[in-house]
Amino acid sequence: MRRLQQSLRRRSARRCPFILIPHRLLTTSYASYKPAPQATLEIEDTNSPTFLLKTSPIQLPARATSDDSAIKAHFDLPHSIFGDMVGVRREHVKGLFHYDSLTQPESLMRLTDRTLIQASAIVQRIVVAPQDPTGRELRLVVKNLDRLSDILCGVIDMCELIRNVHPHQDWVNQSDRTHQILCSFMNELNATRGLYESLAKAIAHPFNDPLTTSELRVARIFLTDFERSGIHLPPSVRERFVKHSDALLFLGRSFLSSASSGPSTVPHIEIPDPHRLLTGLGRQFVDSLPRTGRNGQAVIEPGSWEAQMILRYAREGRARELVYVGGMRADKKRISVLEAMLKERAELASVLGKNNWAEVVLVDKMTKTPENVMRFLTSLAQHHQPVARAEVDMLRRMKATALTGNYFDPRNSRTRHLPLFHAWDRDYYSDKYLTSLIPTGSPPSISPYLSTGTVMSGLSRIFSRLYGISFKPAVVSPGEVWHPSVRRLDVVHEEEGLIGVIYCDFFSRIGKSSGAAHYTVRCSRRVDDDDIDGDGLPEDWDKPYGPGLEADKESLSGKPGKYQLPIIALSMDVGTVNEGRPALLNWQELETLFHEMGHAIHSMIGRTEYHNVSGTRCATDFVELPSILMEHFVSSPEVLSTLAFHHATGEPLPIPVIEAHLALNQSLSALETHGQIAMALLDQKYHTLRHGQDSFDSTAIWFQLQQEIGVIQPVPGTAWQMQFGHLYGYGATYYSYLFDRAIAGKIWSTLFHRSGTSQAYDRKAEGILSREGGELLKEKVLKWGGGRDPWEMVGDVIGGVEGDELSKGDERALALVGSWSVV
């Protein structure tokens, strides 16, 4: 699958919003092992004795450093080397994430009670702030709202991680309970008008010490979230808002559940004369299929593995047609749920005084309005449609050759006499085309060159060269991680020292989700000026509950005050580490790891003064930018040649193999990108529905869109939109990944892609991995998190007249982004 689809399928662990809106989601291949000389490697930790690892072969490239060795050992050696886990600190038991308050599942409820008491005190303080005659409390409203957000989200976000990755059900159950209680408390805050009024007064008040630019941005984000929740509405109107919000929550979950489950499994698909129609799949496959009692028709379950194999390998188009239509057939019940959800959103938008749901959602995004999104997507569609059509015509020529036995030159532009190309032809002829690119039928495996440790040490080198940031393997205390296979990395800047912690849950285990996700455990923020005494809680109020999630206060270079450092966790499923054989990544897993590391490094560098704009807490149509840039790095042959080394021999991945894999990965990309553009346009058309449009027909809209901009015509009787699950979680913002890909491509070519610097790959990599480019990206984009207008950040990076135009964030800026190619 292509990277657009891969990234959009990743499970997104979304940031905890302070204002919890009901419709808003909180949101491996193995190769044979060849023994090599034994290595002695060290894992260093400044706070504990050094462990010596005497183990089976670890081979590194000639230029590898001791840090490379330590990182490689950290991920490539089995955890049994240390008994229970890699790098266990021999001291008393700590709690999860080194918090003393999280030593057992039951401690979550004590933490919940403690959090509710502290949060309630801050809420009361904010509500009465306007009554302070000195104005001091009003001046602290933004700071205290941010503290409140940090206290609540710190627990909610952590529980989101625990309930998704912890292997023990007691922890999962308790985290579910805590999550539910605190989210319910947030819903109560939605109705606390005093919070909204105090914030509005603080924004408008003429303080002698005015709110800073950062404070104003944080304040306006809070204000927008409040108003999106209907807090400013009259009581009778707000009752309607709550009613429609509850209905929308139910409909959204119902739609998402059905979309996630795939096509309806009944009725089954029946294929007559299977030995003839299923030619190309092999007799063993055909004989294994269940049969009906009459005429021996093969029975296929829609959406099954067998159905996928038929779409990909069955030579007879009739078999593929039966399977395609059977998997996409219109289901009136599912369609009615989708359309009810969309109509409910339109009505909710009307309650909020907006024309449509897209207006509600986009008000705080880079694009600002649905009209701007449509202009961007229309521009992309116009650019990509001819290229995508050319790729379809190439597949049509392959179909003509297969049907007639006559050779049709793929380079011939004449299409008049070519056969029609149907939706059920795409997988089959795409696979034939990709196979034709490789003389041997399949590319050499790259997995032996991509052990988890090799890749992680390579990422550390990349970040060191770009930002002066590297990874240091860290020992963990008993109880600090949720499974023995979880590795901890301390993130260290060459001048500032420790700047954050990453927990890496990469390896397979029973019951673990196969998706990839970035979880925020703790955001950065300034903590030395919290004024906790002003909350009015009595001395020793927290003794019955034990400690909270207090963090050490750290000084940051060039910033006043002290900060709590960010903690994030990355979850993937890349196989297991065994004695003598590390977990090896395939190409898709490599891309995914780089993508997630883009989010991780954004969290580490974006150490802002305020929690609510820290790291990845930024606009939906901006947050993917750092991760997409990392995809550019991994797709660069120059960079990949410095990253991939055989796990057993230390030999570099041959350049021809790199080039073959990159060429294969980028083939038919215009067709896939155009499909994503069509999906984003459909999302906008659905969410610009106005309240009262009773004639709304989601299938007709999809068919009309395909007639306008599609390159493969839709099939009568099908309703693909039933399976478009992102319509719930990404309603009106599905364009975001395409938008960020356009911006990332421009930044990549501006800062990093220096063509013609040298014929040698390693010297070209020196140019791409330039400190100058990395520092510009860090200083102008990453360090701000969500604390600065993203248009200004992008404009600063691009520079010149074009950068000045972009900084305005107006229609001209959007037109510029729309003119950039999505690569």
From Swiss-Prot:
<feature type="region of interest" description="Disordered">
    <location>
        <begin position="532"/>
        <end position="553"/>
    </location>
</feature>
<dbReference type="InterPro" id="IPR045090">
    <property type="entry name" value="Pept_M3A_M3B"/>
</dbReference>
<feature type="binding site">
    <location>
        <position position="599"/>
    </location>
    <ligand>
        <name>Zn(2+)</name>
    </ligand>
</feature>
<keyword id="KW-0378">Hydrolase</keyword>
<keyword id="KW-0809">Transit peptide</keyword>
<feature type="transit peptide" description="Mitochondrion">
    <location>
        <begin position="1"/>
        <end position="33"/>
    </location>
</feature>
<keyword id="KW-0479">Metal-binding</keyword>
<dbReference type="Pfam" id="PF01432">
    <property type="entry name" value="Peptidase_M3"/>
</dbReference>
<comment type="function">
    <text>Cleaves proteins, imported into the mitochondrion, to their mature size. While most mitochondrial precursor proteins are processed to the mature form in one step by mitochondrial processing peptidase (MPP), the sequential cleavage by MIP of an octapeptide after initial processing by MPP is a required step for a subgroup of nuclear-encoded precursor proteins destined for the matrix or the inner membrane.</text>
</comment>
<feature type="binding site">
    <location>
        <position position="602"/>
    </location>
    <ligand>
        <name>Zn(2+)</name>
    </ligand>
</feature>
<comment type="similarity">
    <text>Belongs to the peptidase M3 family.</text>
</comment>
<dbReference type="GO" id="GO:0006518">
    <property type="term" value="P:peptide metabolic process"/>
</dbReference>
<keyword id="KW-0862">Zinc</keyword>
<dbReference type="GO" id="GO:0005739">
    <property type="term" value="C:mitochondrion"/>
</dbReference>
<dbReference type="InterPro" id="IPR001567">
    <property type="entry name" value="Pept_M3A_M3B_dom"/>
</dbReference>
<feature type="binding site">
    <location>
        <position position="595"/>
    </location>
    <ligand>
        <name>Zn(2+)</name>
    </ligand>
</feature>
<dbReference type="GO" id="GO:0046872">
    <property type="term" value="F:metal ion binding"/>
</dbReference>
<dbReference type="InterPro" id="IPR024077">
    <property type="entry name" value="Neurolysin/TOP_dom2"/>
</dbReference>
<keyword id="KW-0496">Mitochondrion</keyword>
<dbReference type="GO" id="GO:0005759">
    <property type="term" value="C:mitochondrial matrix"/>
</dbReference>
<dbReference type="GO" id="GO:0006627">
    <property type="term" value="P:protein processing involved in protein targeting to mitochondrion"/>
</dbReference>
<protein>
    <recommendedName>
        <fullName>Mitochondrial intermediate peptidase 2</fullName>
        <ecNumber>3.4.24.59</ecNumber>
    </recommendedName>
</protein>
<keyword id="KW-0482">Metalloprotease</keyword>
<dbReference type="InterPro" id="IPR033851">
    <property type="entry name" value="M3A_MIP"/>
</dbReference>
<dbReference type="InterPro" id="IPR024079">
    <property type="entry name" value="MetalloPept_cat_dom_sf"/>
</dbReference>
<dbReference type="GO" id="GO:0004222">
    <property type="term" value="F:metalloendopeptidase activity"/>
</dbReference>
<keyword id="KW-0645">Protease</keyword>
<feature type="active site">
    <location>
        <position position="596"/>
    </location>
</feature>
